[in-house]
Amino acid sequence: MSFTVIIPARFASSRLPGKPLADIAGKPMIQHVFEKALQSGASRVIIATDNENVADVAKNFGAEVCMTSVNHNSGTERLAEVVEKLAIPDNEIIVNIQGDEPLIPPVIVRQVADNLAKFNVNMASLAVKIHDAEELFNPNAVKVLTDKDGYVLYFSRSVIPYDRDQFMNLQNVQKVQLADAYLRHIGIYAYRAGFIKQYVQWAPTQLENLEKLEQLRVLYNGERIHVELAKEVPAVGVDTAEDLEKVRLILAKD
């Protein structure tokens, strides 16, 4: 099965400016992500960036680069520009890997592409089980709820489903008994290229603006998303300087 990976790489991160070029074990972070994507078996890997320095570095280590606008409001808008510019066929499977995931397991990159191919949907993703109560109540950990067949019912930063009997008068998070129903969404997506172009034609919705979760636009417009449990739990991504140091320590041991 053929699929294409697109890696958005913004230089102007608010919390860690220039992070695509941050050195990790002698390589820029974006190169680590690129190499993981290649290891997944993708037929094509494209780095999408709005920065000439990132583009030059990526070309030097052999990556295909697509320059994109600095004015996109979301990562999906950046993907749509790449799909249009490179005339990628509508039925091609596109996997979106964030440029700040240098430890992403190649096996789950392939898995999300296979997930999309197996089901009659235009979008697929992955999740992992939540085993920690603090993670469950952390709004930065996005929860996902599915039906019995893995089709998404909703994504939220809130606790879903809400255990009324246990949470109504909760005094100590550490005493929470977690059910198997609690899943954390992993921010890796597979789409058909034509669907990405459709997505950006839809207006932003109140749901996505409230939760700050752009995937809710898909559900609002009546499309289905299929989610599987990830075969491997991905390690930390890089959002802050502290995250960067953690990743450096992990890769220094390899």
UniProtKB/Swiss-Prot annotation:
It is an enzyme of class 2 (transferase). Pfam families: CTP_transf_3. CDD domains: CMP-KDO-Synthetase. SUPFAM superfamilies: Nucleotide-diphospho-sugar transferases. Signal peptide: none annotated. InterPro entries: Cytidylyl_trans, KdsB, Nucleotide-diphossugar_trans. Activates KDO (a required 8-carbon sugar) for incorporation into bacterial lipopolysaccharide in Gram-negative bacteria. This is 3-deoxy-manno-octulosonate cytidylyltransferase. It comes from Haemophilus influenzae (strain PittEE). The gene is kdsB.
